[in-house]
Amino acid sequence: WDYRQEDPVNDARGTRLERAAAHPDLLTDAPQLNITNVIAPNGGRIYVDHAHPEYSAPETTDPFEAVRYDRAGDLIMRAAAAKASETTGRKIVLHRNNVDGKGASWGTHENYMMLRSVPFDLVTRLMTTHFVSRQIFIGSGRVGIGEHSENAGYQLSQRADYFHMKVGLQTTFDRPIINTRDESHSTDEYLSLIHI
């Protein structure tokens, strides 16, 4: 992975956070040694994110293709677990979740390219309700309420308890619904990325 394109302190709202003032977890642009980080056969990416394997689907402009890539990720990870089981002689089991009920949450991101000329506050004002309310229809749910599952119950969203603000630059603490990190990874300067 080419970390030279990472710029975790560049905010899509037109500001930059000083590196010295940034929480260490925010500085994700330093290469991580001894971390699995490969390009999948379908053009996606498989890497370790905070001790969890993560699959990142390739880019697409077609929602049906996005679903196929998502399913392909399941198959790729299942094959990797089977190979690891065979190699180590120990059964490797992967679970598709993004919370552990003990305070940790990971994965499940979306990225959308948009024109940089579109005001970021307009996008957040128009899209936040959609990103929150769609859990009613497509949420995978979880048992337990609270970051540490301190209360019994069932929720439609696995990650609802882990969001603490509407918009923000950070990704690993005080998580926002919409992340403002300005890293489009595009050579076109007129494009921006919205990270969910």
Name each model-derived stretch.
Residues 1-95, 104, 125-150, 161, ...:
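Terminal catalytic/cofactor-binding subdomain
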Residues 91-93, 109-111, 153:
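Beta-sheet entry/capping signal
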Residues 98-99, 103-115:
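Histidine-centered divalent-metal-coordination microenvironment in nucleic-acid enzymes
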Residues 118-123:
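Short, conserved charged micro-motifs
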Residues 154-157, 164:
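Long intrinsically disordered, low-complexity regulatory regions enriched in proline and serine/threonine
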